[in-house]
Amino acid sequence: MKFNENLAGLVNYEAGKPIELVVREFGIEAKDVIKLASNENPFGTSPHVVEAIKSAASNAFLYPDDSYFELKEALGAKFGVGTKNIIIGSGSDQIIEFCLHAKANPQSAVLMAGVTFAMYEIYAKQVGAKIYRTRSQEHDLAEFLEIYEAHKDEISVIFLCLPNNPLGECLDTKEVYEFLKRIDEDVLVVLDCAYNEFAKFKDARKGIESSEILKFKNVIYLGTFSKAYGLGGMRVGYGIAKESIISELCKLRAPFNITTLSLKAAIEALKDEEFVTKTLENNLKQMARYEAFAREADIEFIPSYTNFITFKFDKQSASEISQNMLKKGIILRDLKSYKLNAFRITIGQSWQNDRVFEELKQNLK
Amino acid sequence: MKFNENLAGLVNYEAGKPIELVVREFGIEAKDVIKLASNENPFGTSPHVVEAIKSAASNAFLYPDDSYFELKEALGAKFGVGTKNIIIGSGSDQIIEFCLHAKANPQSAVLMAGVTFAMYEIYAKQVGAKIYRTRSQEHDLAEFLEIYEAHKDEISVIFLCLPNNPLGECLDTKEVYEFLKRIDEDVLVVLDCAYNEFAKFKDARKGIESSEILKFKNVIYLGTFSKAYGLGGMRVGYGIAKESIISELCKLRAPFNITTLSLKAAIEALKDEEFVTKTLENNLKQMARYEAFAREADIEFIPSYTNFITFKFDKQSASEISQNMLKKGIILRDLKSYKLNAFRITIGQSWQNDRVFEELKQNLK
């Protein structure tokens, strides 16, 4: 059977390894596995949210209120925007998909950083769009502008990952706003702010404000409940933009794109800012330990504005170290699929990080 | 901002009205609302599954095992197929999307019944494909073949909805297999079996067997946990086909397309066949009451092989009746968006149906 041409060039996203796999492959008990591979919240889910999910569990048979009325009202209040400026996705990933399916096509191109979130390219290829990347791995807006100017007739979508997954760096907000002014209003600029809570907490100059975003006719802010809000497994993300953008993206949203329990969980998660603050505080404190560890062990790292840190290797193989750690029940994220000799470690709780340091030491030469 | 051309022709799917809306608009308490609009399971979710969800609630922060290993093993055992013959979707809806994004394009056409599940057309339009429908509202394979033969060079996907939503009729399996033999191996035939458990229970001649499906190189079977398995709100569906089809569709599946709790719920739901049997038995028994009611009230209906029945009207307005019922807290599904003067009623529990009959009587002239 012949399939659409675009499929020929597609490869699947390589997800972080699940705990179940370590249990299956290495016979380690689930409770002894430390998963720091997928940037989930090391404190789990807020206990209030867990209770809310339990209370709503018997509604699993009911489709959700597809207007997502209550969630949009709550997000609208938090960000100071109207409900018509909000779209809900199955993770912010799905809104990335909507953006590309709405604006990119085989005649257009998509611009992104040299090394950035893999799903941008995957979705862009699904619609047959061309990809431009900056030479630098990290975001460099001068390079973005240079490529943009050279291929203005082609580029229909630009991605800025603020902060950048999987590297960790983050552009200054002021720079970003200046950049946005240079971009034609017909080009959609996606500000992927999945980790922006962490960046803003570390340094206010990295925080993207939705009120500023709504000044632009061609910019969308993406946020998620997967990281700081502790709901990675529930798949809820959101986009904030002018109504003229949101209403078009909504045409691509299938009904019931999040689950009934995800909807409930997200609404409850927004009420527990204390949990988020605890998460952000732990992250900052434990991040300092990783930096100190790396300096002492002479490992190259990128100062991170996220809830993970990426260690780069020169002589040793990062894949080999990751694999050794895996056998000990510690799951890190090998970045081989990003063509890097590096791995990414989610910042865990103190006791988890202790074990990481201990095992890592055994593996460093 | 200009968007891709395909978006111009798109309208959103009109979902069944949620309980929350009736509460908001008519001030009726949620506990007094009877929702028979979206073909959810009137017994809710199996108590065993509800318990499993509660036990897993604290895992909401963890991404699911993206291989869906355990669920695929369980489905494979149930259907007697390999795990590589299975793809998991966010509802079977999402697999409809994958099929169309993989096989349809602006140069191709999609063939379906005169009145059938709205998402086929919506997803087909997303990729700019042309739509052919049979003249008859219900499935008529002679008409399908006639159109297929006349537009063989264009048609890349054919949908058969077995049984058909929102009408309720169901083709005989034997007829379907004969039809499949007449279709070129490069055309993907999608057998949407979301309600097939109900059809098979009523009449064995309507049951589609996955072992038969795997004999064809170009056929995919779609099943769901939303109806007989009582998990509409959890969004889990599956496709079964030759590995050559599944592996291509998997290229379009984003990681973590179902939630951690949905995965758990689906695995547990497969273990409780008793709940499914109870559901099917109630459905058959209560369906007979709806048929008797319709005959007595002289309402036209299509004998249904699903968990709903569609009442067609001639003189009275189905929309008006639906709206009156809504004010009384009973949510039916007006089929105006399908261009029918009809409404669809999910077969409820006995006490729910009593109330429907009572209120309907007040509205019939």
Curated annotation (Swiss-Prot), chains A, B:
Which domain of life does the protein's organism represent?
Bacteria
What is this protein called in UniProt?
Histidinol-phosphate aminotransferase
Q: Which reaction does it catalyse?
A: L-histidinol phosphate + 2-oxoglutarate = 3-(imidazol-4-yl)-2-oxopropyl phosphate + L-glutamate
Q: Name the SUPFAM superfamilies on file.
A: PLP-dependent transferases
Species this chain originates from: Campylobacter curvus (strain 525.92)
**Which CDD domains does this one have?**
AAT_like (cd00609)
Post-translational modification N6-(pyridoxal phosphate)lysine, affected residues: 227
What cofactor(s) does the depicted protein rely on?
pyridoxal 5'-phosphate
The EC number(s) attached to this protein equal 2.6.1.9
Pfam families assigned to the protein according to its UniProt record, in alphabetical order:
Aminotran_1_2
Q: Which UniProt keywords apply?
A: Amino-acid biosynthesis, Aminotransferase, Histidine biosynthesis, Pyridoxal phosphate, Transferase
Indicate yes or no for the key word Nucleus. Answer: no
